[in-house]
């Protein structure tokens, strides 16, 4: 997950969903402690759009990996990023 700090990305539910729907998502990282309904919705959307999903243990770890000081439920590396 070290690549998340330097990759061109978006963090959070709304921005991640938008990136997936607009075809800009290359890889989605989902925290496993997200509400199950949201987790299922995102996994289904990624499957439909052919976007790879990587699960992360918890939101705190994902936030840290993104280089932010708060928890993150999900993050999305954008397709034009060279770091993945």
PLM regions and their residue ranges:
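C-terminal structural segments of small proteins and small subunits
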Residues: 52-84
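Ribosome large-subunit tunnel/peptidyl-transferase-proximal elements
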Residues: 1-25, 35
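Signal for well-folded cores of large energy- and translation-related assemblies
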Residues: 21-24, 43, 47, 67
